[in-house]
Amino acid sequence: MIERGKYQSLTMVNWNGFFARTFDIDGLVTTLSGGNGAGKSTTMAAFITALIPDQTLLHFRNTTEAGSSQSSRDKGLYGKLQPGACYAALDVVNSRNQRLLFAVKLQQVAGRDKKVDIKPFVIQGLPSHVKPTDILVESVSATQARVRQINEVKDAIAEFEGVQFKAFSSIVDYHAQMFEFGVIPKKLRNSSDRSKFYRLIEASLYGGISSAITRSLRDYLLPQNGGVKKAFQDMESALRENRMTLEAIKTTQADRDLFKHLITESTNYVAADYMRHANDRRNKLEQTLSLRSELFGSRETLIEQNNLLNRVQEELELLIESESALEQDYQAASDHLQLVQNALRQQEKIERYQEDLEELSERLEEQMMVVEEAQERVMMVEEQATVAEEEVDSLKTQLADYQQALDVQQTRALQYQQAVQALEKAKQLLGDDCLTAESAQALVSELKNKESESTNALLSVKHKLDMSSAAAEQFETALKLVQSIVGQVERKDAAEQAKIVITKARESQQIAQNEQQWRAQHRDLERSLNQQRQARELVKEYQKQFHVELTDEITFEQERERHAMQIETLEMTQEELREQRSEQRRLEQDAAAEINKLEAIAPTWIAANDALEKLREQSGVDLEDRHAVMSHMQVVLEQEKELSLAKDKLAERRSQLESEIERLASPGGSNDPRLKGLADTLGGVLLSEIYDDITIDDAPYFSAMYGPARHAIVVSDLSGIEEKLVELDDCPEDLYIIEGDIDAFDDSSFDAEELEGAVCVRMNDRQMRYSRFPEIPLFGRAAREQRLELLRNEREEVVEKHAKAAFDSQKMQRLYQAFNQFVANHIQVAFEADPEQALANVREKRGQIARVLADLEAKEQQHRSQLQTSKQALSSLDKLAPNMALIEDDTLQARFDELEEKIAQLSEAKAFLNNHAKAVAELEKIASALDADPEQFDALEAEYKAADEQLQELKKQIFALSDLVERRHYFAYSDSVDLLNQSSELSEQLKAKLVQAEQMRTRSREELKQAQGQMNQYNQVLASLKSSHQAKLETVQEFKQELQEFGVNADEGAEERAIRRRDELHERLHTSRSRKSEYERTITSTELEMKGLAKRLKKVQKEYAELRTFVVAAKAGWCSVLRLARENDVERRLHKRELAYMSADELRSMSDKSLGALRLAVANNDDLRDALRLSEDNARPERKVLFYIAVYQHLRERIRQDIIRTDDPVEAIEEMEVELARLTEELTQRENRLAISSESVASIIKKTIQREQNRIRMLNQGLSNISFGQVKGVRLNVKIRESHEVLLHGLSSQQEQHKDLFESPRFTFSEAMAKLFQRVNPHIDMGQRSPQVLGEELLDYRNYLELSVEVNRGSDGWLQAESGALSTGEAIGTGQSILLMVVQSWEEESRRLRSKDIIPCRLLFLDEAARLDAKSISTLFELCDRLDMQLLIAAPENISPEKGTTYKLVRKVFKDHEHVHVVGLRGFGQTDKPKSEVQEMIEEFES
């Protein structure tokens, strides 16, 4: 790659403040930073002086204009120099890597004009290690140096081998050398070019928008085009050919556009509707099938639901009947339970009252005994009180009557003796010596008990004795009792029957005693029988439900184990089914996601596949994979390159042939068209014109004889020719001039000798020339015409081959573009698997998954039902488990029957006892009378006597003891005996005894009172007890009467049986009601489901009927549509698979949009308009196909068979593209040819204008994003003047109207142009300009254009670039952008003039960059980097850019010496160059 040339350094020698300073120029931006007067402008002035050493232009205003007087003629350069020789040198390395030192020597010229003498020179080939200062400055000593003169500089570089020094006498030569080596962008031929270049540099230096440049942008940006002046020949023929070609292009373009538009819009219109109907039909079919499936399924479900409903209703009716009976039984059982409970409560009350009655009887007896004891105690206390009273009275009497007392004491002594005698008697009778008066009382009670027993025994014996004595009477009584029990009986059998009755009574009593045990057993057996019956019912129900007969516990256990295992298995299976269902659902979701994904990529793949198929058809190669596509694309590219190369070679050959034909057709057949003008200038003729009439045979000889001089100019006199030659500006490098007679030229001046096939010409004694005969002689008109004939024939062949090669190249290029477009858009998906096939597979897989899910759900439902059945079975078995053992027990009924018999016996026994218990009891008492033996009477009498004697003895003992008890208080009179012996103490003793007796009396009275009170209390309690007893007794009798009225045998098991019966019936009733509720819920839910299902069925049936009608009706229409499409071979155009994935709304929108476009497209075609109007009927889709067929037919008729070899409009578009490309290329080639031959002024002007517009547009692209402050972009606005545009239109398109101007011999072409301009623009005043001058201006295309600069500033948008509308920084940035456009334009303009391996340097200036903000400076840096430009800016010392190279300049004054101290900061530019010894010495000297 060719690199752009770069300025490497600027060297200043002997300038103010700079004795010998070299500034390295950065590859991008070099910044000179310093305060005012630091030397920034001086440095830039030195650079500009070395670049444009023209003192007439140099004017450094910033140092001269401010405050300068009119008399001062200093242009700013004189004052910047020191006396003596000064240098400014630019070190440049160009694109060829050549080092060049362009320098100028400056020296002040004495005088008031302050002129400066400037001498430019260049040093080429200087070694890289040698610095410019090493050449321009000479070291005198270690501390001194001097500036060399230019001759000394030349001598100094002579020391280096290969270094060239060249001084220039003119600035033109200096700039020509600069242009040749790529230092400046434009070739500066004259002062005008230099002035433009300087104005550009000046505008760059001082910034802002230069009015001098903006006012004449056309001169700066638009290059001259002198070839327009050569457009006079063959104008009409060239215009006619171009017009024909343009007409063919327009026709082909119109046909192509029409074909494209109609094909695209009609295809979109019809295909969208076609695919919408196809999609709709497919969806309707799917909906119909779905509805039919749902309809049949709903019917089956409805039938099943109806069967279930009928079955449940039947069961419900049976259940209601049984429930009514159960309710009656339950009510009866509840009533019976109520009676039993009432009877039991009554019996409990009777028992409770009887208990209370017995308790009251006991308490009454106890109270009676207590009362008796109380009475006895009262009697004893009364007796004691009476005795005490009597004792007191006696003592008082005794005290009153001592004798009486003495008698009393004697009486008491006698009583005491009698009591002792009674004690002795009792001891004797009882034989107990330990008997005392105190113990006698207790013994009396004991003996009385014995007396009672003895009395009873005596009475019994006496009774028996009396019975025996009264046997006859008792026998009759006993016989009556027996007969009352057993009925009539013989007297002799009475005793036996009495025994039987008594035995039966005893047995009945024994049976009655077993009542509780038997009834408990009866309850247990009855419960067991009920459980057995329920168990057998459960077994029957289980057998009916599960078809398994439970015969024993083993079968029961096996069945329960089977169901338990089945439940476990089913639960595991259900878990597996749930997992499988989850997995299947996940697979279904994955399949749905995959379907969505495939449906999303299917249109892209279909488009890619269609593109691939089209590419295969175009290429004729089976493109199997990406590698094959890329490989064949490379092959196509190589083929296209080969065809393009062949086409280019043929085009080049055609151009060569045309150039050669043109040259040979020109007068003299000269290679250089300038020779004719030079001949006219020099007043001679061409040698070839003199020999124009030679024969073909002589042509080789004369061509070889004259050799290079065959195109010489023959003049009659050579005198004065040299002066004319010096004045020539443009002439061939070698120009031969021969003196001779033009009218009678003689070749004798040539010393020629003809050899074999050659000529030897002796020039002089020391030179000779040997020239062979040319194989193809071109000297002379005959030879040229012969050559022209051959060249024209060859040109025809080349043109034909070129056309064929162009067609093939265009076709191959389009194929490569197709490959390129396919690779860019479709290669990523084209070779992927077919998504439609994958869709079918995934949909089939999803269908399988759906079926598997349905099977799994059915299995799960079946398993759930089985699980529920097994759980119900286990529940039934669990209910049956406690009673399973009873099923096998066949003895229950026998035992129950046996107990029933016992219960019956019990009832009979209880009835017997209830009826005859009292009679039997009486009978038992006198039963013996029936079998009494009269012989037993004596024994009974003897026994009676013995018992009587024993009783009499006991009574004696009791009497003796009673006497002793009665006399026991006489033992207290033991002192009376002593008193009888002590009569003197009797009185005192009596008094003491009286006191004791009174005390005893008082106690006795108290005790009597207490005893009487207590007895009264006891009597009251006894009375209350008697009344309570009587009331309880009456209540018990009433309760017994009520109990008999209940009519219920309220035994212990009656309530339990009643409760069990009621609970059993309640449970059965509850179960029945639960089942009834379940049946009713089932019926209700089933009816609701059936109603909903019937409603849904009607709706589905209606929808199905409507859809089926629609589908059947649409089928016929669709078949007609398909038939039309297939018969007319448009189905493949209409059936676009990618549209199958669009919604109906999208397709309808697509069709409607195309319909609107088609209405406009066919508005001028009656047939298509009518067909389109008919096709808008949505009810007739076949009409859209008919419209599409009509469009195809219409396009087939429009196909030009002369250029298109197909009947298919789609394929015709491709061939039209090829034809259009061929015609366009032909026109382009002709325009190029016309431009080269200057045959069409208007075409060249238009083309030139278009080229410059495109070039300016490219310039705008580089600057559109530039930002300075509020300015966000800079652009050049170029437009054609309306008046000149009308002129161009008249030149190119209205030639027939203006034949009077261009075919008139009265006007030159320039005058005709001026006249035409006046004709087409009558409103424009031409002023004083002549038609010739105006015509020459009209031949310059730059006068046709208007240029202006616009900026995009803030909210104002694009506006005219004027300094007043912009800030200073914005104006500077905008100005730099404009200048950069100019530089780029100059480079493009001069590219053809310079060597191809040279890219010129690009550098601009900017002084006082302080007016730019940091962002704008950054934009400049970015601009330099992007456009490979160098920038030299001056900025105040407070600005230090982060990038590039920055030099800090500080001007210092030491005594009378002034210098600038420089510090360089390297950025990202080039590396520092090593300093030379001289430079180091100079820097040391300056410091």
From Swiss-Prot:
Q: Where in the cell is it found?
A: Cytoplasm, Nucleoid
From the UniProt record, list the coiled-coil ranges. Answer: 297-458, 506-601, 637-666, 781-806, 836-1109, 1210-1266
Q: What is its main location?
A: cytoplasm
Assembly and partners? Answer: Homodimerization via its hinge domain. Binds to DNA via its C-terminal region. Interacts, and probably forms a ternary complex, with MukE and MukF via its C-terminal region. The complex formation is stimulated by calcium or magnesium. Interacts with tubulin-related protein FtsZ.
Query: Which species expresses this protein natively?
Result: Vibrio parahaemolyticus serotype O3:K6 (strain RIMD 2210633)
Q: Does the keyword DNA-binding apply?
A: yes
Record-stated family: Belongs to the SMC family. MukB subfamily.
- What the protein does? Plays a central role in chromosome condensation, segregation and cell cycle progression. Functions as a homodimer, which is essential for chromosome partition. Involved in negative DNA supercoiling in vivo, and by this means organize and compact chromosomes. May achieve or facilitate chromosome segregation by condensation DNA from both sides of a centrally located replisome during cell division.
User: InterPro entries from the xrefs?
Assistant: MukB (IPR012090), MukB/SMC (IPR050308), MukB_hinge (IPR032520), MukB_hinge_sf (IPR042501), MukB_N_dom (IPR007406), P-loop_NTPase (IPR027417)
- How does the record comment on the protein's domains? The hinge domain, which separates the large intramolecular coiled coil regions, allows the homodimerization, forming a V-shaped homodimer.
GO MF term (any one): ATP binding
Q: Which Pfam families match?
A: MukB, MukB_hinge, SbcC_Walker_B
What domain of life does the UniProt record list for this protein's source? Bacteria
**Which GO cellular component terms, listed alphabetically, does the Swiss-Prot or TrEMBL entry include?**
cytoplasm; nucleoid
> What residues does ATP bind to?
34-41
Name the gene that codes for it.
mukB
* Name this polypeptide is given: Chromosome partition protein MukB
The answer to whether keyword ATP-binding applies is: yes
